Amino acid sequence: MKNTTWLRWLAILLALGLVAAACSSGNDDDAETADTATAASDDSGDSDADAGTDTDVGLDLDLGSVCPSPLVIQTDWFAEAEHGALYELVGDDYTVDGDNLVVSGSAQLGGQDLGIDIEVRSGGPAIGFAAPRVQMYTDDSIHLGYTTTDQQMTAWDDLPLISVIAPLDINPQIIMWDADVYPDIKSIADVGAAGITVNLFQAGGFPEAFVAQGIWTQDQVDPSYDGGPARFIAEGDLAQQGFASAEPFNYEFVFEEYGKAPAFQLLHDAGWQVYSQSLGVKPADLEELRPCLEKFVPIVQQAIVDSVTNPARSNAIIVDAVETFDSFWAYSAELAAWSVQQQIDLGLVGNGGDGIVGNMDGARIQAIIDAQREAGIELLDGLSAEDTFTNEFIDDSIGF
């Protein structure tokens, strides 16, 4: 487990960019105690995969006449709780391909069969640490894949994807620091004002924007982060990037030499409000997939709600998949349960401002495009938010 964080960050670096963050306020008290995490796991992480409850969700669940089978979705990493909605859709007959890091089976929602098979493919080493969009333009069998707003814009000229639903309303990426060393630091702006070195991977996206906006100075940005915890723990006086849905748990319960949750702020709260891990389709495929998406996107919306309000089923599949993959990535039931609760507490998953789950705000996307241009990041001329997403398939009645 101690090696998994830096390996994940290495994968992100190799996938051509940093995952920029999104919203909700972070603080240094968000990590649960070890006992709480274990108790939550008993309720929502260790249950059998067939623990879901049959429900009548009021949706058209017949995908057999409109969707390809299997419907293939490419993720950006190994199975983890942030991907819960996708694994919620996998039926109890699922199989795990440990060689190719794929979970597949009949598609279901609330115990009801959807009439097709579904295939959830891991990213990272399964696709040579490429971004999902790269794999989608290499392998035509993939129908949808994860994408993140800032990377979506920089890649638009060559590898465009149109986002059709955002399972996460807020990106989990953070900047974190040691609250004992810096008790008066409360925000990313405070980090900048104090002149604290910010240890990142290579510059890209949000660092350029923060420098351009005067939040940080260029000499604060140290792009030498190797993904491991050693320097942050040993030196103590650095700020560092991470994920709110994992790092607080790992630094408190896994990295025993540190033994506490770091303080942090989500990048969203500092103004970098990207959508992370939205599901995108290639523009050339949109019309062909439209009849499928009209039914499938509302089903994903409901799966988001189901996997958060009762995460036992999806967490069990995720943990089973990672164990069966038997790779360098480890993912415990305790972390899965803690992560879901953390996503709830921070608003990483939830409704937008209009009470609808999964839809996207064009103004928020346009603000990222504008910030990228102001920071000197090269984008396709004329690119605007409306080109890159659609809410047309969203069911406005579905939310938490």
Which ranges hold each PLM region?
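Short, glycine-/small- and polar/acidic-enriched structural segments
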Residues: G52, V57-Y225, L238, G242
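Short, solvent-exposed loop/beta-turn-alpha elements that line the ligand-binding surface or hinge
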Residues: T95-D113, I185, F264-W272, E287, ...
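Bacterial N-terminal signal peptides that target proteins for export
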Residues: M1-L10
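Bacterial lipoprotein signal-peptidase II cleavage site
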Residues: S24-T33, D46
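Secondary-structure end/capping motifs
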Residues: E288-A375
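Pocket-lining segment of extracytoplasmic ligand-binding domains
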Residues: D150, Y225-A230, E235-D326
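C-terminal motif of bacterial Sec signal peptides marking the signal peptidase cleavage site
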Residues: V19-A22
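Conserved C-terminal helix/tail region of periplasmic/extracytoplasmic solute-binding proteins
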Residues: G58, G362-F400
